[in-house]
A protein has these predicted regions:
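Short, flexible boundary segments at extreme N-termini or domain junctions of P-loop NTPases and their
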Residues: 1-48, 79, 189, 202-223, ...
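Glycine-rich phosphate-binding P-loop
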Residues: 42-64
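Switch I (effector-binding) loop of TRAFAC-class P-loop GTPase G-domains
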Residues: 61-90
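Switch II of P-loop NTPase G domains
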Residues: 77-81, 88-145
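Canonical P-loop GTPase G-domain recognition
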Residues: 164-267, 276-277
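A charged amphipathic helix-loop-strand protein-protein interaction module that recurs
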Residues: 262-263, 293-348
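Short hydrophobic alpha-helical segments used for membrane anchoring or interfacial signaling
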Residues: 278-284
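Short hydrophobic/glycine-rich mini-motifs in sensory/regulatory modules
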Residues: 351-358
Length: 372
């Protein structure tokens, strides 16, 4: 009887298992690398020299008072800082000097270095600039470079120093500037589409990820060019009021990982304690990370109350620092409670290592639930 070679099924199974394990390990390594990139976001802060970029950065992240920013000098080339936010998110913040020579360098020799792997572009316009056409021409070149190298980046435009415009005409001036910037943005996108016609068409939906589309997707060189003039966000800002906190809270909101989980848990907490409203602040900057409002609280007529609270708490923190002699970046308080008879009750307390929470209770509710 002839002998036949039997296939070595044990060896084949072992080889398949080893290959599967290798593939799994590679996938996990890639996922970890992706998550690491998500948690370290490259943020470009750009605009003409003197537009107020470094001032707003110092107020938000370095606890400067508005009046203290007068002693800040002009930014030379790129001022790179790593801002830790909520513990696990690092903002790789590139504060780019706005002098003409630097701008030309960013758009030529350093083009790929500056505009690659960008998560967010924050562009600042000085509303009182005397050379608007030149400012817009530079902006068009910046947007073209961004779309070329990081076409999935989010764009935020801040129309700054709005306090210098008369209150009666402020809204009209802002609306006209917004329309102009959107039109110029469309022109910049059209330039790149003309150069790369193969990348025209609507953008596909980004892959799901923690914290929304921004946190779950990274720029792809082959993705279609988006309609930035539609998706971009524009804000009127000033260092002298709460408008700066509104703009920067919106920027941070798009960068926070697991934001949907935070919002869900905050809503559950609000319902459980029968609150009117809850705000979650980042500990150092006091930017609003997330918020929840009850159906009754939605009737509050003050739409800017969230950024107002950021501004008030930051000012109170500065006051505590002044009278206690502690550094501005130090933790100035753990909690406080405020009551107005039976009509209003609110408390602010340290919530986690990196956050504070503000809770407003409905009229008549006892506010003794604030931690002691």
């Amino acid at each position: 009887m002839a002998d036949y070679d039997q296939p070595n099924t044990g060896a084949s199974t072992a080889a398949a298992a080893a290959a599967a394990a290798t593939a799994t390990a590679a996938a996990q390594a890639a996922a970890q690398a992706q998550l690491k990139k998500v948690k370290k976001q490259k943020v470009l802060l750009m605009g003409k020299s003197g537009s107020g970029k470094s001032s707003m950065r110092s107020i938000i992240f370095s606890n400067y008072l508005a009046r203290d920013t007068r002693r800040l000098g002009a930014t030379i080339d790129i001022d790179l800082s790593h801002v830790k936010f909520l513990g696990n998110l690092t903002l790789n913040l590139w504060d780019c000097g706005g002098q003409e020579a630097f701008m030309e360098n960013y758009l030529s020799q350093q083009r790929a270095h500056v505009f690659s792997n960008v998560g967010v572009l924050i562009y600042v316009f000085d509303i009182e600039s005397r050379d608007v056409d030149r400012d817009l021409a530079t902006y068009v070149n910046i947007i073209s470079a961004l779309v070329q190298y990081s076409r999935e980046a989010k764009v935020f435009v801040l129309i700054h120093k709005m306090d210098l415009i008369q209150p009666m005409t402020r809204e009209d001036v802002f609306d006209r500037r917004v329309a102009l910037v959107r039109r110029k943005t469309a022109e910049a996108v059209a330039i790149v589409r003309k150069q790369k016609p193969e990348l025209t068409g609507p953008s596909p939906p980004p892959p799901p990820g923690p914290g929304g589309a921004m946190a779950g997707s990274l720029p792809s060189p082959d993705s279609p060019i988006p309609d930035l003039e539609v998706s971009m966000q524009l804000f009127a800002t000033s260092i002298w009021d709460q408008s700066l906190y509104k703009a920067w809270a919106s920027i941070i909101h798009d960068l926070v990982p697991n934001l949907s989980v935070i919002e869900t848990q905050l809503a559950s907490l609000g319902v459980a304690i029968d609150a009117d409203e809850i705000l979650l602040f980042e500990r150092t900057s006091f930017l609003v990370v997330s918020k929840w409002t009850s159906p009754e609280g939605e009737s509050n007529p003050y739409g800017d109350r969230f950024e107002r609270m950021s501004n008030i708490l930051k000012a109170w923190k500065h006051t505590c620092s002044k009278f206690t002699g502690t550094p501005r970046n130090a933790e100035q308080f753990s909690d406080f409670e405020y009551k107005m008879g039976a009509n209003f009750s609110m408390f602010v307390t340290k919530f986690t290592t990196n956050t504070y929470i503000l809770v407003c209770m409905p009229p008549g509710e006892a506010s003794s639930i604030a931690p002691s």
